[in-house]
Amino acid sequence: MDSISLLPDDFLLRILSLLPTKDVLNTSVLSKRWRYLWKLVPKLQYSLIDKNADHGTFVRFVDRSLLLSMAPVLESLHLKLGRQCSEVDIGFWVRIAVEKGLCELDFDYEHYKTEPCRLPQSLFTCGTLTVLKLKNVSLKDVQFPVCFKLLKTLHLEYVIFLDKETPQKLLSSCPILEVFDLTRDDDDVDNVMSFSVMVPSLQRFIYCGGSGAELVMNTPSLKYLKLSGCGYECMIGNLPEIVEAHVEVACSTDDILTSLASVKRLLLCLPTEPELPTGTIFHQLEHLEFCSCCTEWDILMFMLKHSPKLRSLKLNETHGYTIVSQSDPMFHWEEPSSVPETLMFVLETLEWRNYRGLKMENELASFLLKHSRRLKIATFSPADCKQVRIELRTTVGMKYRILMELARLPRGSAECELVFG
């Protein structure tokens, strides 16, 4: 302990900031110097989700440690609470943190079939916040306008709004917002049928939506986009700055793909028979990951045909086959009448994960290897033999057969190295 005590305060505070506040306070018994050091820790973490925990003791502990905090700036407050904590206590803690110049709030309210938590109005006029993360919170009673002049990161998970206008009022109060992560429930549980994201400064947007909703986007500075979920409609404006996108949706896709014409890295997992855009060319696309779980291979051929700079292609059964029958479109593939020029002149890397060696897969693998004249490396990783569904299991014997079949396939590139992962 003597050697640790010789370390400078700044270094010790960085270490203590990584610990839950309860553990930080326990260090005060180590020495006289440590007795007051915990009061300067700029990051505080509190958690009470155990139903059997002593609620009164926890409340007194949080009250005391927050009130005694002497950090010049309260960098972050992380609250993970259950419904045994009242809104009165929670509001008191948040108000104290705001008064201490709070920079980051991560509020996770664990509830089950109960009303989401309401937070004090003072939070929504906190001029020092740069990061705000809310889970299971109600914004019905928030009085607008609000002010988040320094907020750059906003996470909303299962948040309830007053009406469809509330989200845009909130976002318009964040003039320099760069990161927005939004998770919604099904239907109109959050009281917003059409969610509008109109943020000129936004650079990163992650959206997970349920069914029966609509997403409208106008984010011209966006560089990263991730869309997941099913049953919602998307209307997306032009994204001239987009660099990377993950699209895993079961909804109308032509508008989405059209807006991603400038993307450089793209992951696609689309429904069967998707709507494909007419005339869209992915001039900047260099890396494509294509999910093979439940989509038709015509989509892949479409992407190869319209991506003249594609250097890397990855195929991956991310979610597992949802249908196993001879009528499943995944079990049928017809060779196109013409070979995409991307295969002949550009593609350098091919990776296929969870390869099962199905007749259709073998035909597609043969087509890709045969016509990829610039291919440098092709990696095939057989599917896991521990699949719960018997019909999808790949035994050791099957893996050996698969690898032998792949090794015998002709390759259009003399430099192509075949790797079995």
Curated annotation (Swiss-Prot):
SUPFAM superfamilies: F-box domain (SSF81383), RNI-like (SSF52047). PROSITE patterns: FBOX. Residues 1-52 form the F-box domain. It comes from the Eukaryota. Residues 332-382 form the FBD domain. It holds the Pfam family LRR_At5g56370. PANTHER family: EMB|CAB62440.1-RELATED, F-BOX/RNI SUPERFAMILY PROTEIN-RELATED. This is FBD-associated F-box protein At5g56370. It comes from Arabidopsis thaliana (Mouse-ear cress).
